[in-house]
Amino acid sequence: INFDYEIEAKAFGGAGIDASGHPLPDDTLAAAKTADAILLAAIGSPQYDKAPVRPEQGLLAIRKELNLFANIRPVRIFDALRHLSPLKAERIAGVDFVVVRELTGGIYFGQHTLTENSACDINEYSASEIRRIMRKAFAIARGRNKKVTSIDKQNVLATSKLWRQIAEEVAKEYSDVTLEHQLVDSAAMVMITNPACFDVVVTENLFGDILSDESSVLPGTLGVMPSASHSESGPSLYEPIHGSAPDIAGKGIANPISMILSVAMMLRDSFGETAGAEMIEHAVNKTLTQGILTRDLGGLANTKQMTAAIIANL
């Protein structure tokens, strides 16, 4: 595996606020728009919790600016870490699925009204927004076990009625892929009682936010889960799913695996370097199997030691 790359670092989140007063500085956005891919570090700090400008606002902004409509979160459980899962071994056997979350529509981007005695949040989706996220999910399923579970609240919400209608229409374009529907409350239960039944899960922004976080509980740690966010034609963004962990800042003990696996996703999805991605994933698995674990995994390795072990196993 041999290819050239160039890394350019830009301020974002809290660093962006400190540098320019905005979590997504203009020069950072300009660089992101011209990049081949974006690797995003974890953001957030207690110092901004009550501030009018917060690091998390930069996430919503960059998703909208780059039209990152599809968030992809793989969920798998490493054999060496099965003991960390809060579920019994038989419940997590065979768990390997992907959550596909619509990321730029829905209630998070609707109109928000707050008065002293009432509040209103508008949840709106167009057919085109639903259709493109469905096609993304079906395309992913076609390369896996050919099953899509579409999650909605069709028995109550108008947006979910449209969601289910478009799902059925898109399913006709992928005759080799099976489509099933689940209501979100039922899906939340099944994700704990029988998570191995899922292959590709697709849902709207709010439901996806909740269910993807629920799925992250299955491996027993946030430290080994990567994610990607894709646009239709621009650069994709890759990031670990965990936060910035300010309580251990500067101690050098953070688990680097989520970021390393995010790099593997970047190699595969943005650069077409499938062999390189698989090498990284195999190296991570081998390292864990060897019993080299960071503190959040019950071991003693620090960040640099874990990273060095993974590199050695490449």
Region spans (language model):
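Glycine-rich phosphate/diphosphate-binding loop of Rossmann-like nucleotide-binding domains
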Residues: 1, 116-185, 197
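N-terminal beta-loop-helix "entrance" segment that forms/cooperates
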Residues: 2-26, 191
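Flexible, glycine/charged-enriched surface loops at secondary-structure junctions
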Residues: 2-6, 144-152, 174-182, 272-281, ...
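Short acidic loop-to-helix transition motifs that present clustered carboxylates
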Residues: 13, 80, 182-189
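Glycine-rich phosphate/nucleotide-binding loop
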Residues: 14-17, 191-292
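N-terminal glycine-rich phosphate/adenylate-binding segment common to multiple enzyme folds
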Residues: 18-123, 206
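Short, glycine-/small-residue-rich phosphate/pyrophosphate-handling segment
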Residues: 77-108, 124, 128, 243-277
